[in-house]
């Protein structure tokens, strides 16, 4: 926990108000009133920090940092590569990105630069080093914020210029060595797409190649690598005169960049959380999505993360942008902390008067100062967080289950032309995660490079691609006593999207032989029974055969494949593996995972059934985490968050004895929660 306390604050843009000293003075006074203890500076300040090439003006920034320090407000200092000044693009137009259609962008928007460009890298490296030298040892500067929402330029973040084409070819040479290996990996003899010269290779383009999924996958990997390398360059630049940790702000399940690769350049994970609260009357789907994203960020490094941005109330970039209803700001903020965040930060502190984000929510609106509902909501969070500092310092969530979410698998599933063109990998994974969330079973969100040894249960929905070593890792996990769940259309292809021949890589573990995949329309949906209830088999129905010894729990009831298995369980070593051959609905996933949790010995922190809309998480001291398989440490002392996402009161029964960590109230057997309320509990000693 940075500074030993939870951070509360957000993006502060004083450069927009340098001609209004009374505003800057008022800002600090109101920050103290709102309980703000940390702000992020300099995110989009390049044009003010370097108004002319090589002419730096840091004095205004130093004055702001010093004034914040006098008020005991800490600073996260950004490098300003998120948006370029016009003098740069005018003098060096070659730094601007080239689109997939070959057209070079005009100046504008954000991140409109080539990550490969040596000139761009040199310019920002020099500026970053100067910032590091001037501010890297300031007492109240605690963290580097590298750029901003990398690749977030209203496109896919890729540049297709000749520099990038050349770098891509060199990357491919390093990966494959020879064109023969590349042609084999991309199945180049199909349609005579055999490359005989490295110069023939070009990035995917709407007026060029769009049908070779191996090329598409490698291009996406290359873009991630170039962007990660750029981020690493900035990390090294600020480290020249400073030993502060560094982060950059991620954007949930952002398809274009593999965050599991990018995170390797960072010391701390942070991200920007903008759930679509009040999209519908039922807030649970949005709560599940936000919880999934928080869990994914925490899981990347198995440590607390930072909520770098969130909206104090409204945003400005969806078709309709509802304000947060009373109670939702506190609940949404506490949800982040409950899942492992050591901060609640906002975009932004004060609304700007003009341009694109002038109507994006902020702590301070254009008028009325602190006399607004939003300010009061923020101030309430500012009062609550310090009460949790002592309890949460050094704590981390410690799930015993994991769900696979892998970027390369995502790219492959949605790029291929297969049984369906409308496969939605994140939606599929999220439907499985919801079954965990509703039971209060925490899960890490991991990729195929993760270590599985600390988990009792691993679920891998729609695991189409098997990276090298993944099958062996899963096999060892199950052999050693783990429970593995996977689904239809899994284990189909390798990392370059070449289909496996012969057998499924985990056929012996799963106990199932794949044969066909039916993608029925609604009129031809199938059905099956599980635990005495009927469920739909829809959209993807795999026609499989159970191997000898495999337990068939459900079969199709219709069509020519009636009697073929839908749900199977196979004992392998000390563990077991489940295969779900068809897509079904949430009702089935609830029933299925309820049984799996029981077999895995997984319970929520309250060890009770949760009402609809309620979930729980737990943070415990990292050095007190229960040892794997150690029953004596199962009732460790932790901090439990009980969250109600229903806009109505609920009662949680059968909870045992707990103490409210903030009020000291003792709860025995039941806990009553108001609408959109979060309770923070400590276990009562027996």
Features from the language model and the residues they span:
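Boundary/entry segment of secreted carbohydrate-active catalytic domains
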Residues: 1-20
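Short, well-ordered coil/turn segments that N-cap beta-strands
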Residues: 4-8, 35-37, 69-75, 137-142, ...
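Aromatic-lined substrate-binding rim segments of carbohydrate-active enzymes
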Residues: 25-33, 40-103, 233-241, 464
